[in-house]
């Protein structure tokens, strides 16, 4: 299964250098968000993508499908994370089916 990344240019470059299989960079414009929506839909419908990473900023601008596979995770971009501990717990619960508590 492949890992795909959808994000801004800097985030995409970082994940490409880290070895992500497919990396797609977008600008924060309405036209680019439409391209991102189409690419996200395509990646979800393909059978060879297991994980999709999307920057938090872009995830707020598009509808994230509620699917089990591929796992869709939001990652921070260069401006930092907007997630709190509770949101991270929910991501882990959806990804592995177990709720983590302190």
Curated annotation (Swiss-Prot):
One example GO MF annotation: ATP binding
UniProt lineage = Archaea, Thermoproteota, Thermoprotei, Desulfurococcales, Desulfurococcaceae
Any GO BP annotation: proton motive force-driven plasma membrane ATP synthesis
Free-text function comment from the UniProt entry: Component of the A-type ATP synthase that produces ATP from ADP in the presence of a proton gradient across the membrane.
User: Where would you find this protein in the cell?
Assistant: Cell membrane
Known NCBIfam families for this protein? Answer: PRK03957.1 (NF003047)
- What this protein is called in its record is A-type ATP synthase subunit F
* Similarity comment: Belongs to the V-ATPase F subunit family.
The UniProt entry's GO CC annotations, sorted and at most eight, read: plasma membrane
Q: Which InterPro entries match?
A: ATPase_V1-cplx_f_g_su, ATPase_V1-cplx_fsu_bac/arc, ATPase_V1_fsu_sf
Species of provenance: Desulfurococcus sp. (strain SY)
């Amino acid at each position: 299964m492949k890992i795909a990344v959808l994000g801004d240019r800097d985030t995409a470059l970082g994940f490409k250098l880290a070895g992500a299989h497919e990396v797609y960079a977008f600008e924060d414009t309405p036209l680019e968000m439409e391209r991102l929506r189409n690419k996200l839909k395509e990646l979800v419908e393909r059978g060879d993508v297991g994980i999709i990473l999307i920057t938090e900023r872009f995830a707020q601008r598009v509808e994230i499908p509620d699917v089990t596979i591929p796992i869709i995770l939001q990652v921070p971009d260069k401006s930092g994370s907007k997630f709190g501990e509770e949101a991270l717990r929910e991501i882990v619960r959806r990804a592995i089916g177990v709720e983590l508590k302190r």
